[in-house]
Protein backbone atom coordinates (compact mmCIF):
# COMPACT_ATOMS: atom_id res chain seq x y z
CA UNK A 1 0.00 0.00 0.00
CA UNK A 2 1.26 3.43 -0.94
CA UNK A 3 2.09 5.75 1.97
CA UNK A 4 -0.47 8.27 3.14
CA UNK A 5 0.10 11.35 1.02
CA UNK A 6 -2.25 13.82 2.67
CA UNK A 7 -4.07 14.21 5.95
CA UNK A 8 -7.37 16.09 6.25
CA UNK A 9 -9.94 16.89 8.89
CA UNK A 10 -12.75 15.79 6.58
CA UNK A 11 -12.83 13.55 3.52
CA UNK A 12 -16.05 13.66 1.50
CA UNK A 13 -16.65 10.82 -0.97
CA UNK A 14 -19.12 12.00 -3.58
CA UNK A 15 -19.41 15.34 -5.35
CA UNK A 16 -23.18 15.49 -5.52
CA UNK A 17 -25.46 17.98 -3.81
CA UNK A 18 -25.07 16.63 -0.28
CA UNK A 19 -21.33 16.06 -0.46
CA UNK A 20 -20.67 19.47 -1.97
CA UNK A 21 -22.80 21.24 0.61
CA UNK A 22 -21.15 19.46 3.52
CA UNK A 23 -17.61 19.93 2.19
CA UNK A 24 -18.04 23.65 1.54
CA UNK A 25 -19.72 24.29 4.90
CA UNK A 26 -16.94 22.41 6.72
CA UNK A 27 -14.28 24.44 4.92
CA UNK A 28 -16.02 27.68 5.89
CA UNK A 29 -15.79 26.52 9.50
CA UNK A 30 -12.01 26.26 9.05
CA UNK A 31 -11.68 22.52 8.50
CA UNK A 32 -9.15 21.08 6.06
CA UNK A 33 -11.41 19.33 3.54
CA UNK A 34 -11.02 17.14 0.47
CA UNK A 35 -13.82 16.17 -1.91
CA UNK A 36 -13.47 12.97 -3.95
CA UNK A 37 -15.58 12.48 -7.08
CA UNK A 38 -15.26 9.58 -9.52
CA UNK A 39 -17.21 10.83 -12.54
CA UNK A 40 -15.07 13.88 -13.29
CA UNK A 41 -18.18 16.09 -13.11
CA UNK A 42 -19.41 17.76 -9.94
CA UNK A 43 -23.10 18.10 -9.13
CA UNK A 44 -24.17 14.48 -8.86
CA UNK A 45 -27.42 13.07 -10.18
CA UNK A 46 -29.39 16.27 -9.63
CA UNK A 47 -27.28 18.47 -11.86
CA UNK A 48 -26.19 15.93 -14.46
CA UNK A 49 -29.07 13.45 -14.83
CA UNK A 50 -31.84 14.57 -12.50
CA UNK A 51 -33.57 17.67 -11.17
CA UNK A 52 -31.95 20.31 -13.36
CA UNK A 53 -32.09 18.77 -16.86
CA UNK A 54 -35.46 17.22 -16.01
CA UNK A 55 -36.93 20.60 -15.05
CA UNK A 56 -35.58 22.07 -18.28
CA UNK A 57 -37.49 19.42 -20.22
CA UNK A 58 -40.57 19.87 -18.02
CA UNK A 59 -40.55 23.62 -18.68
CA UNK A 60 -40.48 23.01 -22.43
CA UNK A 61 -43.24 20.41 -22.21
CA UNK A 62 -45.33 22.74 -20.05
CA UNK A 63 -44.85 25.52 -22.60
CA UNK A 64 -46.14 23.21 -25.33
CA UNK A 65 -49.19 22.32 -23.25
CA UNK A 66 -49.97 26.00 -22.65
CA UNK A 67 -49.46 26.92 -26.32
CA UNK A 68 -52.06 24.37 -27.37
CA UNK A 69 -54.72 26.66 -25.91
CA UNK A 70 -53.40 29.79 -27.62
CA UNK A 71 -56.14 29.87 -30.27
CA UNK A 72 -58.82 29.73 -27.57
CA UNK A 73 -57.11 32.66 -25.87
CA UNK A 74 -57.28 34.95 -28.89
CA UNK A 75 -54.37 33.91 -31.09
CA UNK A 76 -56.17 32.31 -34.08
CA UNK A 77 -53.05 31.93 -36.21
CA UNK A 78 -50.95 30.33 -33.49
CA UNK A 79 -49.60 26.91 -34.33
CA UNK A 80 -46.81 24.71 -33.05
CA UNK A 81 -44.02 23.65 -35.35
CA UNK A 82 -41.91 20.54 -34.95
CA UNK A 83 -39.81 20.19 -31.82
CA UNK A 84 -36.03 20.22 -32.30
CA UNK A 85 -34.94 17.65 -29.72
CA UNK A 86 -31.30 17.70 -30.84
CA UNK A 87 -30.99 21.46 -30.49
CA UNK A 88 -32.42 21.40 -26.98
CA UNK A 89 -30.09 18.55 -26.00
CA UNK A 90 -27.07 20.54 -27.16
CA UNK A 91 -28.18 23.66 -25.29
CA UNK A 92 -29.10 21.64 -22.19
CA UNK A 93 -25.74 19.85 -22.17
CA UNK A 94 -23.93 23.17 -22.51
CA UNK A 95 -25.90 24.59 -19.60
CA UNK A 96 -25.11 21.58 -17.42
CA UNK A 97 -21.46 21.93 -18.39
CA UNK A 98 -21.49 25.52 -17.17
CA UNK A 99 -22.99 24.38 -13.87
CA UNK A 100 -20.25 21.76 -13.50
CA UNK A 101 -17.70 24.53 -13.91
CA UNK A 102 -19.45 26.77 -11.39
CA UNK A 103 -19.43 23.97 -8.81
CA UNK A 104 -15.73 23.35 -9.32
CA UNK A 105 -14.90 27.05 -9.03
CA UNK A 106 -16.95 27.31 -5.83
CA UNK A 107 -15.14 24.33 -4.33
CA UNK A 108 -11.77 25.87 -5.15
CA UNK A 109 -12.87 29.28 -3.85
CA UNK A 110 -13.82 27.75 -0.50
CA UNK A 111 -10.46 26.02 -0.19
CA UNK A 112 -11.73 22.47 -0.63
CA UNK A 113 -9.23 20.11 -2.28
CA UNK A 114 -10.95 18.47 -5.27
CA UNK A 115 -9.69 14.94 -5.95
CA UNK A 116 -10.88 13.33 -9.19
CA UNK A 117 -10.82 9.57 -8.83
CA UNK A 118 -12.42 6.39 -7.52
CA UNK A 119 -12.35 6.00 -3.74
CA UNK A 120 -12.26 2.83 -1.66
CA UNK A 121 -11.77 2.38 2.07
CA UNK A 122 -8.50 1.14 3.50
CA UNK A 123 -9.52 1.58 7.13
CA UNK A 124 -12.07 3.61 9.14
CA UNK A 125 -9.85 6.69 8.69
CA UNK A 126 -8.12 6.01 5.35
CA UNK A 127 -9.27 6.05 1.74
CA UNK A 128 -7.37 4.95 -1.37
CA UNK A 129 -8.12 6.87 -4.57
CA UNK A 130 -7.39 5.58 -8.07
CA UNK A 131 -6.69 8.90 -9.72
CA UNK A 132 -8.55 9.74 -12.93
CA UNK A 133 -5.46 11.44 -14.36
CA UNK A 134 -3.67 8.09 -14.53
CA UNK A 135 -1.13 8.98 -11.86
CA UNK A 136 -1.90 5.85 -9.88
CA UNK A 137 -3.30 5.34 -6.40
CA UNK A 138 -2.99 7.78 -3.53
CA UNK A 139 -4.06 7.25 0.06
CA UNK A 140 -5.67 9.97 2.15
CA UNK A 141 -6.64 10.01 5.82
CA UNK A 142 -9.03 12.11 7.85
CA UNK A 143 -10.59 12.43 11.28
CA UNK A 144 -14.01 12.06 9.65
CA UNK A 145 -15.03 10.51 6.34
CA UNK A 146 -18.42 11.21 4.76
CA UNK A 147 -20.01 8.81 2.29
CA UNK A 148 -22.30 10.78 -0.04
CA UNK A 149 -22.06 8.77 -3.24
CA UNK A 150 -25.76 8.80 -4.13
CA UNK A 151 -27.56 6.11 -6.09
CA UNK A 152 -27.98 4.69 -9.57
CA UNK A 153 -30.92 3.38 -11.63
CA UNK A 154 -31.84 -0.30 -11.32
CA UNK A 155 -32.05 -2.55 -14.38
CA UNK A 156 -34.00 -5.85 -14.66
CA UNK A 157 -30.92 -7.78 -15.77
CA UNK A 158 -32.78 -11.10 -15.56
CA UNK A 159 -35.02 -10.15 -18.49
CA UNK A 160 -33.38 -11.21 -21.78
CA UNK A 161 -32.73 -8.15 -23.92
CA UNK A 162 -33.29 -5.65 -21.09
CA UNK A 163 -29.99 -4.03 -22.04
CA UNK A 164 -31.58 -2.71 -25.23
CA UNK A 165 -33.54 -0.28 -23.10
CA UNK A 166 -32.31 2.84 -21.35
CA UNK A 167 -32.69 4.19 -17.82
CA UNK A 168 -33.45 7.70 -16.58
CA UNK A 169 -29.80 8.67 -17.13
CA UNK A 170 -30.12 7.45 -20.70
CA UNK A 171 -33.11 9.71 -21.28
CA UNK A 172 -30.75 12.69 -21.21
CA UNK A 173 -28.40 11.00 -23.68
CA UNK A 174 -31.07 10.54 -26.38
CA UNK A 175 -29.96 12.37 -29.52
CA UNK A 176 -33.40 12.36 -31.13
CA UNK A 177 -37.01 12.15 -30.03
CA UNK A 178 -38.55 8.68 -30.21
CA UNK A 179 -41.89 8.38 -31.96
CA UNK A 180 -43.09 5.63 -29.63
CA UNK A 181 -41.84 4.93 -26.11
CA UNK A 182 -42.57 2.36 -23.40
CA UNK A 183 -41.81 3.35 -19.81
CA UNK A 184 -41.72 0.66 -17.14
CA UNK A 185 -42.21 1.93 -13.60
CA UNK A 186 -44.75 3.54 -11.31
CA UNK A 187 -42.69 6.07 -9.36
CA UNK A 188 -42.23 9.77 -9.83
CA UNK A 189 -39.37 9.38 -12.34
CA UNK A 190 -41.51 7.26 -14.66
CA UNK A 191 -44.44 9.65 -14.32
CA UNK A 192 -42.38 12.78 -14.93
CA UNK A 193 -40.65 11.43 -18.03
CA UNK A 194 -43.92 10.08 -19.41
CA UNK A 195 -45.42 13.55 -19.10
CA UNK A 196 -42.51 15.11 -20.98
CA UNK A 197 -42.57 12.57 -23.80
CA UNK A 198 -46.33 12.87 -24.27
CA UNK A 199 -46.40 16.67 -24.23
CA UNK A 200 -43.73 16.77 -26.92
CA UNK A 201 -45.70 14.43 -29.16
CA UNK A 202 -44.24 10.98 -28.51
CA UNK A 203 -46.76 8.14 -28.35
CA UNK A 204 -46.30 7.18 -24.72
CA UNK A 205 -47.04 3.89 -22.97
CA UNK A 206 -46.56 3.24 -19.26
CA UNK A 207 -46.44 -0.29 -17.87
CA UNK A 208 -47.17 -0.59 -14.14
CA UNK A 209 -47.64 -3.68 -11.98
CA UNK A 210 -50.54 -2.37 -9.89
CA UNK A 211 -53.77 -0.52 -10.66
CA UNK A 212 -52.22 2.93 -10.19
CA UNK A 213 -48.88 4.71 -10.06
CA UNK A 214 -47.46 6.99 -7.32
CA UNK A 215 -49.03 4.68 -4.74
CA UNK A 216 -47.01 6.18 -1.85
CA UNK A 217 -48.71 9.52 -2.42
CA UNK A 218 -52.17 10.58 -1.29
CA UNK A 219 -54.87 9.30 -3.67
CA UNK A 220 -55.74 12.80 -4.87
CA UNK A 221 -52.26 12.94 -6.40
CA UNK A 222 -52.06 9.44 -7.85
CA UNK A 223 -55.66 9.45 -9.08
CA UNK A 224 -55.56 13.05 -10.29
CA UNK A 225 -52.44 12.65 -12.40
CA UNK A 226 -53.49 9.25 -13.71
CA UNK A 227 -56.90 10.53 -14.80
CA UNK A 228 -55.31 13.44 -16.64
CA UNK A 229 -52.66 11.23 -18.24
CA UNK A 230 -55.38 9.05 -19.70
CA UNK A 231 -57.35 12.14 -20.76
CA UNK A 232 -54.42 13.49 -22.78
CA UNK A 233 -53.71 10.15 -24.43
CA UNK A 234 -50.97 8.54 -22.35
CA UNK A 235 -51.54 4.79 -22.43
CA UNK A 236 -51.25 3.45 -18.89
CA UNK A 237 -51.12 -0.35 -18.94
CA UNK A 238 -52.17 -1.33 -15.42
CA UNK A 239 -51.63 -4.69 -13.70
CA UNK A 240 -48.90 -5.39 -16.22
CA UNK A 241 -46.85 -8.55 -15.87
CA UNK A 242 -43.08 -8.53 -16.22
CA UNK A 243 -41.91 -8.63 -19.82
CA UNK A 244 -40.81 -12.04 -21.09
CA UNK A 245 -38.01 -10.65 -23.23
CA UNK A 246 -36.96 -7.68 -25.36
CA UNK A 247 -35.79 -8.17 -28.92
CA UNK A 248 -33.96 -5.67 -31.12
CA UNK A 249 -35.26 -5.75 -34.69
CA UNK A 250 -33.19 -5.07 -37.85
CA UNK A 251 -35.09 -1.77 -38.18
CA UNK A 252 -33.71 -0.65 -34.83
CA UNK A 253 -37.11 -0.92 -33.17
CA UNK A 254 -37.50 -2.89 -29.97
CA UNK A 255 -40.02 -5.71 -29.81
CA UNK A 256 -41.36 -6.29 -26.31
CA UNK A 257 -42.58 -9.84 -25.74
CA UNK A 258 -45.23 -10.04 -23.04
CA UNK A 259 -46.14 -13.02 -20.89
CA UNK A 260 -49.39 -13.68 -22.76
CA UNK A 261 -47.51 -14.09 -26.04
CA UNK A 262 -48.40 -10.69 -27.45
CA UNK A 263 -45.73 -8.31 -28.75
CA UNK A 264 -45.36 -4.55 -28.68
CA UNK A 265 -42.95 -2.50 -30.81
CA UNK A 266 -41.39 0.79 -29.66
CA UNK A 267 -38.48 3.02 -30.61
CA UNK A 268 -37.32 3.41 -27.00
CA UNK A 269 -37.83 1.35 -23.85
CA UNK A 270 -37.12 3.18 -20.61
CA UNK A 271 -36.66 1.36 -17.32
CA UNK A 272 -37.69 3.45 -14.29
CA UNK A 273 -38.13 0.66 -11.76
CA UNK A 274 -36.16 2.13 -8.88
CA UNK A 275 -32.72 3.14 -7.69
CA UNK A 276 -30.03 1.52 -5.57
CA UNK A 277 -27.14 2.93 -3.48
CA UNK A 278 -23.92 3.41 -5.45
CA UNK A 279 -21.61 1.50 -3.10
CA UNK A 280 -19.83 -0.74 -5.61
CA UNK A 281 -16.08 -0.52 -5.21
CA UNK A 282 -16.15 1.41 -1.93
CA UNK A 283 -14.96 -1.64 0.04
CA UNK A 284 -17.10 -0.68 3.00
CA UNK A 285 -16.04 -3.86 4.77
CA UNK A 286 -12.55 -2.39 5.20
CA UNK A 287 -14.07 0.33 7.37
CA UNK A 288 -16.61 -1.98 9.01
CA UNK A 289 -19.60 0.06 7.82
CA UNK A 290 -22.90 -1.81 8.07
CA UNK A 291 -25.54 -1.82 5.35
CA UNK A 292 -28.99 -3.23 4.82
CA UNK A 293 -29.30 -6.26 2.49
CA UNK A 294 -30.16 -3.90 -0.38
CA UNK A 295 -26.93 -1.95 0.11
CA UNK A 296 -28.39 1.08 1.89
CA UNK A 297 -25.92 2.39 4.46
CA UNK A 298 -27.40 2.41 7.95
CA UNK A 299 -27.22 5.92 9.40
CA UNK A 300 -29.22 7.77 12.05
CA UNK A 301 -30.70 11.28 11.82
CA UNK A 302 -27.31 12.67 12.84
CA UNK A 303 -25.84 10.90 9.76
CA UNK A 304 -23.79 8.58 12.00
CA UNK A 305 -23.00 5.05 10.84
CA UNK A 306 -21.95 2.25 13.18
CA UNK A 307 -18.33 3.44 12.75
CA UNK A 308 -17.60 6.63 14.77
CA UNK A 309 -15.32 8.13 12.11
CA UNK A 310 -17.62 7.42 9.15
CA UNK A 311 -20.74 9.45 8.35
CA UNK A 312 -23.22 9.05 5.52
CA UNK A 313 -26.05 11.03 3.96
CA UNK A 314 -28.21 11.40 0.88
CA UNK A 315 -29.59 8.74 -1.43
CA UNK A 316 -27.06 6.14 -0.29
CA UNK A 317 -28.85 6.14 3.09
CA UNK A 318 -32.31 5.72 1.59
CA UNK A 319 -33.84 8.59 3.58
CA UNK A 320 -36.01 10.91 1.48
CA UNK A 321 -34.03 10.81 -1.75
CA UNK A 322 -34.34 14.52 -2.51
CA UNK A 323 -31.59 17.00 -3.35
CA UNK A 324 -32.60 19.68 -0.80
CA UNK A 325 -32.69 17.01 1.91
CA UNK A 326 -29.11 15.97 1.16
CA UNK A 327 -27.97 19.61 1.08
CA UNK A 328 -29.65 20.44 4.39
CA UNK A 329 -28.35 17.28 6.05
CA UNK A 330 -24.83 17.94 4.77
CA UNK A 331 -24.69 21.50 6.06
CA UNK A 332 -26.06 20.57 9.47
CA UNK A 333 -23.58 17.73 9.74
CA UNK A 334 -20.65 20.07 9.14
CA UNK A 335 -22.11 22.60 11.57
CA UNK A 336 -22.04 19.89 14.23
CA UNK A 337 -18.63 18.42 13.40
CA UNK A 338 -16.75 21.67 12.81
CA UNK A 339 -19.01 24.61 13.68
CA UNK A 340 -19.60 23.98 17.36
CA UNK A 341 -23.37 23.46 17.00
CA UNK A 342 -23.53 20.29 19.06
CA UNK A 343 -27.09 19.20 18.27
CA UNK A 344 -27.23 20.24 14.61
CA UNK A 345 -29.04 17.66 12.50
CA UNK A 346 -31.81 17.51 9.95
CA UNK A 347 -35.40 16.94 11.01
CA UNK A 348 -36.65 14.47 8.42
CA UNK A 349 -40.30 15.08 9.29
CA UNK A 350 -42.60 17.29 7.19
CA UNK A 351 -40.33 17.66 4.18
CA UNK A 352 -42.12 19.03 1.10
CA UNK A 353 -41.72 17.28 -2.24
CA UNK A 354 -43.04 17.75 -5.75
CA UNK A 355 -43.82 15.58 -8.75
CA UNK A 356 -43.16 17.54 -11.93
CA UNK A 357 -45.82 15.73 -13.90
CA UNK A 358 -48.47 17.24 -16.15
CA UNK A 359 -50.19 18.51 -14.06
CA UNK A 360 -47.60 19.04 -11.36
CA UNK A 361 -48.26 17.91 -7.80
CA UNK A 362 -46.89 18.71 -4.36
CA UNK A 363 -47.11 17.12 -0.94
CA UNK A 364 -45.96 17.64 2.64
CA UNK A 365 -46.75 15.67 5.77
CA UNK A 366 -49.11 12.74 6.14
CA UNK A 367 -51.51 11.29 3.62
CA UNK A 368 -55.10 11.00 4.79
CA UNK A 369 -54.66 7.30 5.55
CA UNK A 370 -51.36 7.86 7.37
CA UNK A 371 -53.02 10.51 9.52
CA UNK A 372 -55.89 8.15 10.38
CA UNK A 373 -53.42 5.40 11.27
CA UNK A 374 -51.43 7.76 13.51
CA UNK A 375 -54.15 9.75 15.25
CA UNK A 376 -57.32 7.70 14.82
CA UNK A 377 -60.13 8.39 12.37
CA UNK A 378 -62.19 10.37 14.89
CA UNK A 379 -59.32 12.86 15.31
CA UNK A 380 -58.95 13.63 11.60
CA UNK A 381 -60.73 16.34 9.62
CA UNK A 382 -60.14 16.51 5.88
CA UNK A 383 -60.87 19.49 3.63
CA UNK A 384 -61.06 19.04 -0.15
CA UNK A 385 -61.53 21.35 -3.09
CA UNK A 386 -61.52 20.79 -6.85
CA UNK A 387 -61.78 23.60 -9.40
CA UNK A 388 -60.55 24.98 -12.71
CA UNK A 389 -58.09 27.84 -12.36
CA UNK A 390 -58.91 31.23 -13.85
CA UNK A 391 -56.13 30.73 -16.40
CA UNK A 392 -58.45 28.21 -18.09
CA UNK A 393 -61.49 30.52 -18.16
CA UNK A 394 -61.25 31.04 -21.93
CA UNK A 395 -60.56 27.38 -22.67
CA UNK A 396 -62.98 24.61 -23.63
CA UNK A 397 -63.74 22.15 -20.83
CA UNK A 398 -61.91 19.26 -22.45
CA UNK A 399 -58.68 21.30 -22.52
CA UNK A 400 -58.82 22.44 -18.92
CA UNK A 401 -56.45 20.98 -16.34
CA UNK A 402 -58.31 20.61 -13.03
CA UNK A 403 -56.78 21.63 -9.72
CA UNK A 404 -57.36 19.54 -6.59
CA UNK A 405 -56.26 20.33 -3.03
CA UNK A 406 -56.53 18.35 0.20
CA UNK A 407 -55.83 19.62 3.71
CA UNK A 408 -55.48 16.98 6.45
CA UNK A 409 -55.93 18.23 10.03
CA UNK A 410 -55.60 16.40 13.35
CA UNK A 411 -56.77 16.86 16.93
CA UNK A 412 -59.04 19.39 18.61
CA UNK A 413 -56.89 22.30 17.39
CA UNK A 414 -56.97 20.93 13.84
CA UNK A 415 -53.22 21.08 13.38
CA UNK A 416 -52.38 20.77 9.70
CA UNK A 417 -50.54 17.46 9.37
CA UNK A 418 -50.81 17.00 5.61
CA UNK A 419 -51.22 19.09 2.47
CA UNK A 420 -51.59 17.63 -1.02
CA UNK A 421 -51.85 19.64 -4.23
CA UNK A 422 -52.46 18.77 -7.87
CA UNK A 423 -52.55 21.47 -10.52
CA UNK A 424 -50.68 24.39 -12.03
CA UNK A 425 -48.17 26.19 -9.78
CA UNK A 426 -48.30 23.45 -7.11
CA UNK A 427 -44.54 23.55 -6.51
CA UNK A 428 -44.41 27.29 -5.96
CA UNK A 429 -47.52 27.27 -3.78
CA UNK A 430 -46.24 24.42 -1.62
CA UNK A 431 -42.97 26.10 -0.69
CA UNK A 432 -44.69 28.88 1.27
CA UNK A 433 -47.34 26.70 2.84
CA UNK A 434 -44.62 24.21 3.76
CA UNK A 435 -43.06 26.84 6.04
CA UNK A 436 -46.39 27.33 7.80
CA UNK A 437 -46.91 23.61 8.30
CA UNK A 438 -43.35 23.17 9.56
CA UNK A 439 -44.09 25.88 12.13
CA UNK A 440 -47.13 23.95 13.38
CA UNK A 441 -49.93 25.88 11.67
CA UNK A 442 -53.55 24.99 12.42
CA UNK A 443 -56.63 25.28 10.26
CA UNK A 444 -57.55 28.49 12.10
CA UNK A 445 -54.12 29.91 11.20
CA UNK A 446 -54.85 29.21 7.56
CA UNK A 447 -58.32 30.76 7.91
CA UNK A 448 -56.90 33.89 9.54
CA UNK A 449 -54.87 34.74 6.45
CA UNK A 450 -56.67 37.06 4.03
CA UNK A 451 -56.86 35.52 0.58
CA UNK A 452 -55.02 36.90 -2.44
CA UNK A 453 -57.60 37.10 -5.21
CA UNK A 454 -57.78 35.80 -7.85
CA UNK A 455 -55.29 32.97 -7.29
CA UNK A 456 -55.41 29.21 -6.98
CA UNK A 457 -53.62 29.36 -3.62
CA UNK A 458 -56.44 31.36 -2.04
CA UNK A 459 -58.48 28.16 -1.97
CA UNK A 460 -56.23 26.91 0.84
CA UNK A 461 -57.18 29.76 3.16
CA UNK A 462 -60.90 29.63 2.36
CA UNK A 463 -61.59 25.91 2.76
CA UNK A 464 -64.79 24.99 4.59
From Swiss-Prot:
Its cofactor is FAD. It comes from the Eukaryota. It holds the Pfam family Pyr_redox_dim. Its EC number is 1.8.1.7. The keyword Signal does not apply. It is found in: Cytoplasm; Mitochondrion. Keywords: Cytoplasm, Disulfide bond, FAD, Flavoprotein, Mitochondrion, NADP, Oxidoreductase, Redox-active center. Coiled coil: none annotated. Catalyzes the reduction of glutathione disulfide (GSSG) to reduced glutathione (GSH). Constitutes the major mechanism to maintain a high GSH:GSSG ratio in the cytosol. Homodimer. This is Glutathione reductase. It comes from Schizosaccharomyces pombe (strain 972 / ATCC 24843) (Fission yeast). The lineage of its organism: Eukaryota, Fungi, Dikarya, Ascomycota, Taphrinomycotina. The gene is pgr1.
Amino acid sequence: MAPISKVFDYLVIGGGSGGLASARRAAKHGAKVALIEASGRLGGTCVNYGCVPKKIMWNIADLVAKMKTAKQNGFPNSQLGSFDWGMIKRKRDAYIGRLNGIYERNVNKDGVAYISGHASFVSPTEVAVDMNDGSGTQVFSAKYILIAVGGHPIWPSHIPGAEYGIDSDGFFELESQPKRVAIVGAGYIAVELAGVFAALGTETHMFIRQSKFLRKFDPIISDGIMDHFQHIGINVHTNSLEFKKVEKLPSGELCIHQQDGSTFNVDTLLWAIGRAPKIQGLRLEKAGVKTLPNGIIIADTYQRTNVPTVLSLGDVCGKLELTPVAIAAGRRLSDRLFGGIKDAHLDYEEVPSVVFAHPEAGTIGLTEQEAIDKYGESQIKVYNTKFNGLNYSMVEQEDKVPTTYKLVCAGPLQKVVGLHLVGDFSAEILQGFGVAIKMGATKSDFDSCVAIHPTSAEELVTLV
